Amino acid sequence: PERARRFLGKKHPLPVVPANARNVRSVVRAARGCHLLVNASPAKFNESALRAALRLRAHYLDLSANLGRNPFKAEQLGYAKRFAQKRRAAVINAGVAPGLTNLLVARSAELLDRMDTVHIRLYESTVGDTAVSQWSAEGLFDEAVSRPRVFRDGRFRLAPRFSERERFRFPAPIGAVSVVLAAQDEVATLPYHLPLRHLDVKIGGNEIDRLRRWYRQGKLRPSRGMVAARFPGTLTPRQVARLIRCGKLQNARLAVAVLAGGTRKDLPVEIRWDVSFPTLYQIRMRGLGVTPIAYATAQMAALFVRYFPRQLRGVFAPEALPAETRRQVLNAARTRGFAITRKLRQGKRSLDEEW
């Protein structure tokens, strides 16, 4: 409760109730009377939150998957029948990556007669004199020590950590950067809902470069645990503002690119989506002390809540939502400061469009 108050501020009217996220009964007591349970805790608590939502007969939404039992299938999908029996809906992985990326892949599938390949590329960077976690330290550590999941030739595989390095060009002002395979959750849902042959996710930026360097130095091993010096806790808005004022944190940036390849009218087609988000500086100018990843994830979660499909029954990844719901969320994302651009190439023809 104390940490939550530091995020919200002492005068915020939102009630803060303590709960043990590992204990289903504790979550049920804290959330009694709610209609929608939003789980923004680390993914290792997903199943406790899912069971609590079922006991409460509440709808459910979360931001990521744990993949502890099956590295290739989101554990939340196993609760589909139970949510259907309770006549409730669960929307999972409803953030930016996964979340927004899934919506863009699904939109690409609508534009193509057949979609074969999907490449998702992410960029995360900070400019400053101190190490800052743009998102959950637990999530960053889990991604750093987990083997990346890929979908190749219609089969799931585990790839070596930080492998398949390549140069990828993001729109200005980022430009060309090195990207490597990452353990992202999109691979654990997209192949189950869309006919694909190839899918991978790579990340670039100085944060992933730092993790890759530590890995090559032998400093990233699950047995060694999470070292606080390398994986600092998530900063409160007040701490972010203090670092900016002191000049220790100048800026931070997040970008997403989704490339989908397939055919339309028997011709090869490539669709590219680029999404740029408000930078740390731009967010600070709005009076908010949060990082770009935290801001973008919170905005996407809010949009999924706003357009929550209460009429559905079961568990749904973003790409499995009704087309109208997906379009509403994508259109609303643009009003939150997300610049979404689509480029379509068919043969020698190229067309640039603002979403």
Sequence positions of predicted segments:
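NAD(P)-binding Rossmann-fold cofactor-contacting core
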Residues: 1-7
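Short acidic/histidine-rich motifs immediately flanking catalytic phosphotransfer sites
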Residues: 11-12, 31-36, 55-56
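Conserved Rossmann-fold cofactor-binding substructure of NAD(P)-dependent oxidoreductases
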Residues: 18-36, 40, 45
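ADP-ribose/adenylate-binding Rossmann-like module
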Residues: 42, 52-74
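Rossmann-fold NAD(P)-binding glycine/threonine-rich loop
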Residues: 64-90
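Adenosine-phosphate binding glycine-rich loop
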Residues: 82, 86-125
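C-terminal catalytic/substrate-binding lobe primarily of soluble NAD(P)-dependent oxidoreductases
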Residues: 110-355
